[in-house]
Regions:
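Preference for solvent-exposed, low-hydrophobicity sequence contexts
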Residues: 1-218
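Extracellular/virion structural assembly segments
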Residues: 2-4, 8-12, 20-22, 155, ...
Length: 347
């Protein structure tokens, strides 16, 4: 599938202007959500003088401006068919570069996500068209109740065909006739055989695919974690083994002043005010492979997490990235704190 230029706005996205004889430079940013046209006037205009007569290079980090147009206030909504991704979870960016303030050098269009690159990838990394690694194998919880089970985001260039292929060779297809950012569902009817399903996107002669394999759990309540991953998209992860919920309360204790010496022995002389509590949950992944460390790492680095549909923050701050050569059986335990007081105090 042809690559589309993208911006990962949690990492710096550097625009560089270094032209002979320039004394200043300018960047115009046009930022908008959805599939409509670019704004008629720049959303932001940035300019600066060159550092010196011998150092003409000027650089701009546009990521902070882009992030203002992306939010994940709306949880992932699953559908049986391929549908457009919520327009607030990505945006379009047009960048115009100018020598001095009037000489237009070029105009470049991007699709921006709230993703990031690792240090080893260098600056302005390209993370691909998928919100999961291309040609990878992903695992999901199949309870035979939820249809669909999960989804992933993809930038699809039309015309393309999304193909769900079961292990027995049977397929379902959906034709995409409009270029855009889509959520691709993992449909449980195809996965019920227990051998998983491969989702492929075919464009001309290019085929990209991700395999999804179901896992069943009979003993424990499976905990679902929704988080925004490194690609700037919602991703689901399931923790299959024992989980523990803990409540911690806080309050302010005072000594009471008795109104008279004949005090009420049923009242006591100390009282707690403004009592409230928070809840944490510890979850266990169950036995996983070495490469699951990447998913755990992205959960730890996520700024938006839901635990069984409720907003939460990561309480685990560090853990060992395990390897089967050292630890034959790998299990990850994470702790989350729900991001609200147990007694509602929101005004």
């Amino acid at each position: 599938m042809p690559a589309v230029l993208n911006i990962n706005a949690r990492s710096p996205f550097i625009v560089e202007i270094n032209e002979a004889l320039q004394t200043s430079s300018k960047v115009e940013l046009f930022i908008w959500n959805g599939t409509g046209s670019a704004p008629a006037t720049p959303t932001y205009t940035l300019s600066k003088n060159v550092p010196s007569a011998t150092n003409l290079k000027t650089i701009y980090d546009v990521s902070p401006f882009v992030r203002e147009f992306i939010n994940f206030d709306t949880p992932l909504v699953l559908s049986n068919t391929v549908e457009l991704t919520n327009i607030n979870q990505w945006c379009n960016v047009r960048i115009k570069r100018y020598k001095n303030t009037s000489t237009l050098l070029n105009t470049t269009d991007y699709v921006a996500y709230d993703g990031y690159g690792y240090f080893e990838q260098g600056y302005n990394p390209y993370n691909g068209n998928f919100s999961l690694p291309d040609n990878s194998t992903q695992y999901f919880y199949n309870d035979n109740l939820t249809i669909p089970i999960a989804s992933f985001r993809a930038y699809i260039t039309a015309p393309s065909t999304v193909v769900w292929t079961n292990a027995d060779g049977s397929t379902n297809n959906q034709l995409i006739t409009t270029t855009g950012v889509y959520n691709i569902p993992i449909v449980s009817e195809i996965s019920d055989a227990g051998n998983g399903v491969t989702v492929s996107i075919i464009n001309a002669t290019t085929l990209n695919g991700i395999k999804f394999v179901p896992i069943e759990e009979c003993k424990y309540d499976v905990i679902t974690i929704d988080f925004v991953n490194k690609y700037g998209a919602w991703q689901k992860a399931w923790f299959y083994k024992a989980s523990t919920n803990t409540i911690e309360t806080t309050g302010t204790e005072y000594n009471l002043l008795s109104a008279n010496t004949a005090y009420n022995v049923n009242v006591g002389s100390r009282k707690v005010f403004n009592v409230n509590g928070t809840e944490t949950i510890k979850v266990n992944s169950g036995w996983v492979n070495d490469d699951y460390a990447e998913t755990i790492q992205q959960i730890l680095l996520s700024e938006r997490i839901l635990v069984d549909g409720k907003p939460a923050n990561m309480k685990t701050k560090s853990l060992d990235k395990q390897k089967q050569i050292n630890t034959k059986m790998i299990n990850y335990q994470l702790e989350f704190q729900f991001a609200f007081d147990m007694i509602n105090t929101t005004k």
